[in-house]
């Protein structure tokens, strides 16, 4: 064995000194199998496009899972912060969460172990009921412990990276933290009982929101059907004296002006021919003669 290591043959291997090793390290040369590898051999060992695509898919899937985990932790943190913002009491004489008065005249109180605040029994949670001395926690501290347990903060000694849910309504990722969609206020149909104002006019009920044509037709019909001598509820003159439709009904249908002018001219011609002077001149009618 000694001859093998310290032999005098020319082909025997000798361990290089530190200087040579440092020089070979700078020149990237050595006794490795990859030292004298050619460029063609290196290209032949490169990844194929299918392998690159598979690796990229694995990386993208890991990134998506990481984002989902951050969103899940963000929802837990948002819920905890919402509970902290909604406190109503001071934790001394009032319940920290609901603000109920504590003491002899109020409800019984318990002492939270973590935040050292007083809460009522409804807002407190008994953490260790099996022990002789019960351990009480408020809902905020209990939720904080739950966040540390479910987010892995107990392992990392702190809350990991998270993404808070969006504040825009309807854009939150989780339905429990998504605010209710704001629906546009629908215009309620106007009730006919409340929107219509009925007035007693001319013996019948007339709606104020009816069309003007229906009002005119109904009023003209009432004028025709109302007997003469009945007084108008809005005026003092009887219906027969108001020059309304009663006289027109008594006198019958009116004739056109052309027909009247024609009949008057014919009547005048007949009268003129009967009383005309034989000499051709018009004859004047004399008035009643007085006593001679």
From Swiss-Prot:
GO terms for molecular function: small GTPase binding; zinc ion binding. CDD domains: FYVE_RPH3L (cd15763). Residues 257-269 have a biased composition (Low complexity). The modification Phosphoserine is found at residue 248. It is found in: Cytoplasm; Cytoplasmic vesicle, Secretory vesicle membrane. Keywords: Cytoplasm, Cytoplasmic vesicle, Exocytosis, Membrane, Metal-binding, Phosphoprotein, Zinc, Zinc-finger. One of its GO terms (cellular component) is transport vesicle membrane. The keyword Phosphoprotein applies. SUPFAM superfamilies: FYVE/PHD zinc finger. It comes from the Eukaryota. Residues 221-235 have a biased composition (Basic and acidic residues). Zn(2+) 1 binds at residues 95, 98, 120, 123. Residues 175-292 are annotated as: Disordered. GO terms for biological process: calcium-dependent activation of synaptic vesicle fusion; intracellular protein transport; positive regulation of calcium ion-dependent exocytosis. Residues 41-158 form the RabBD domain. Zn(2+) 2 binds at residues 112, 115, 138, 141. A zinc finger (FYVE-type) spans 89-146. Recruited to dense-core vesicles through specific interaction with RAB27A in endocrine cells. Interacts with RAB3A, RAB3B, RAB3C and RAB3D. Interacts with ZYX. The N-terminus of the RabBD domain is necessary and sufficient for interaction with RAB27A. Rab GTPase effector involved in the late steps of regulated exocytosis, both in endocrine and exocrine cells. This is Rab effector Noc2. It comes from Bos taurus (Bovine). The gene is RPH3AL.
């Amino acid at each position: 064995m000694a001859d093998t290591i310290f032999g005098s043959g020319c082909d025997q291997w000798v361990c290089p000194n530190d200087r040579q090793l440092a020089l070979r390290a700078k020149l990237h040369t050595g006794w490795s199998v990859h030292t004298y590898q050619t460029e063609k051999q290196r290209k032949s060992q490169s990844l194929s496009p299918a392998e690159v695509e598979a690796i990229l898919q694995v990386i993208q899937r890991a990134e998506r899972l990481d984002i989902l985990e951050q969103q899940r932790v963000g929802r837990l943190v948002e819920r905890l912060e919402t509970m902290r913002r909604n406190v109503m009491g001071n934790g001394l004489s009032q319940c920290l969460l609901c603000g109920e008065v504590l003491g002899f005249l109020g409800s019984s109180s318990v002492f939270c172990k973590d935040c050292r605040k007083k809460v009522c029994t409804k807002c407190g949670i008994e953490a260790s009921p099996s022990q002789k001395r019960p351990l009480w926690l408020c809902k905020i501290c209990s939720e904080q412990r739950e966040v540390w347990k479910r987010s892995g903060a107990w392992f990392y000694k702190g809350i990991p990276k998270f993404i808070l849910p969006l504040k825009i309504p309807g854009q939150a990722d989780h339905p429990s933290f998504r605010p209710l969609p704001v629906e546009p206020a629908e215009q309620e149909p106007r009730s006919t009982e409340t929107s219509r104002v009925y007035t007693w006019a001319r013996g019948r009920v007339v709606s104020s929101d009816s069309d003007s044509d229906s009002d005119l037709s109904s009023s003209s019909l009432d004028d025709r059907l109302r007997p003469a001598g009945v007084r108008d509820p809005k005026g003092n003159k009887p219906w027969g004296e108001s020059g309304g439709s009663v006289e027109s009904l008594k006198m019958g249908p009116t004739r056109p002006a052309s027909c009247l002018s024609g009949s008057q001219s014919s009547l005048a011609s007949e009268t003129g021919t009967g009383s005309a002077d034989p000499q051709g001149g018009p004859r004047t009618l004399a008035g009643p003669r007085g006593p001679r």
